[in-house]
UniProtKB/Swiss-Prot annotation:
Keywords (A to Z) from UniProt: Activator, Nucleus, Transcription, Transcription regulation
Protein name: Mediator of RNA polymerase II transcription subunit 31
Organism: Xenopus tropicalis
Name of the gene this protein is made from: med31
Gene3D superfamilies: Mediator of RNA polymerase II, submodule Med31 (Soh1)
InterPro entries: Med31_sf (IPR038089), Mediator_Med31 (IPR008831)
Organism lineage: Eukaryota, Metazoa, Chordata, Craniata, Vertebrata
Length: 128
């Protein structure tokens, strides 16, 4: 019952700690570290990962700087994925895929922004 009576300060600290931890899950090397030390075999830790799924709610997700952490959190719900993370090659593969995603995402986003800017410029000149 005492745990339900958190002060505002305790709630703020818990929010910050959970936010930081969830974002750490975006790092495949950190996931490999956790797997090699047996955290993913601990039932209470796996339950904690399940509890953290509330971060997928837009009310909380808006605070995330690394949204790919939510995808990793989702994958961590699967035992097979947790077991594979012990292998450093698995973490390396995930890391490489994230880099490729961001490289292509950045280029695509830049092209989209340029096209939007050109369209706005055309609209401004044709509207005069």
């Amino acid at each position: 019952m005492a745990a339900a009576m958190e002060t505002d300060e305790q709630q703020r600290i818990r929010f910050q700690l959970e936010l930081e931890f969830v974002q750490c899950l975006a790092n495949p090397n950190y996931l490999n570290f956790l797997a090699q030390r047996g955290y993913f075999k601990d039932k209470s830790f796996v339950n904690y990962l399940k509890y953290l799924l509330y971060w997928k709610d837009p009310e909380y997700a808006k605070y995330l700087k690394y949204p790919q952490c939510l995808h990793m959190l989702e994958l961590l719900q699967y035992e097979h994925f947790r077991k594979e993370l012990v292998n450093a090659q698995c973490a390396k593969f995930i890391d490489e895929q994230q880099i490729l995603h961001w490289q292509h995402y950045s280029r695509k986003r830049m092209r989209m922004q340029q096209a939007l800017a050109e369209q706005q410029q055309q609209n401004n000149t044709s509207g005069k």
